[in-house]
């Protein structure tokens, strides 16, 4: 799956910036805490989480999708959690997905830092 390749890049990106306690939605890592909404049978699991100086970060790989409603709901949740914990929310957009991601950020006024990855 292509997203797994980008999750590994996100882990490297976070480590290079001094984040530790990395959890990732990959088999070889501890899975980040999942969040559920009432009446929603699918939990929201961040792609990557980490900490630096007790500040929590959430990282999502931002790729194009047909289900933008669910994607935006997840991003709003992670953005809110990051704010509550004094941390940051990063969206890492692979080549070809940056414009799509920027449009969603602008349309829904999401508080996230967009980072381009290759």
Regions found by a protein language model. Name each.
Residues 46-74:
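Conserved catalytic cores of phosphodiester-cleaving nucleases, focusing on short active-site segments
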């Amino acid at each position: 799956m292509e997203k797994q390749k980008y999750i590994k890049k996100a882990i490297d990106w976070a480590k290079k910036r001094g984040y530790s306690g990395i959890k990732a939605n990959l088999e070889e890592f501890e899975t980040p805490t999942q969040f559920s909404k009432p009446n929603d049978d699918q939990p929201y699991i961040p792609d990557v989480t980490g900490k630096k100086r007790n500040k929590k970060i959430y990282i999502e790989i931002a790729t194009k999708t047909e289900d933008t409603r669910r994607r935006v709901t997840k991003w709003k949740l992670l953005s809110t959690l990051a704010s509550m914990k004094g941390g940051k929310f990063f969206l890492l957009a692979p080549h070809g997905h940056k414009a799509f991601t920027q449009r969603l950020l602008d349309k829904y006024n999401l508080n996230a830092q967009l980072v381009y990855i290759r």
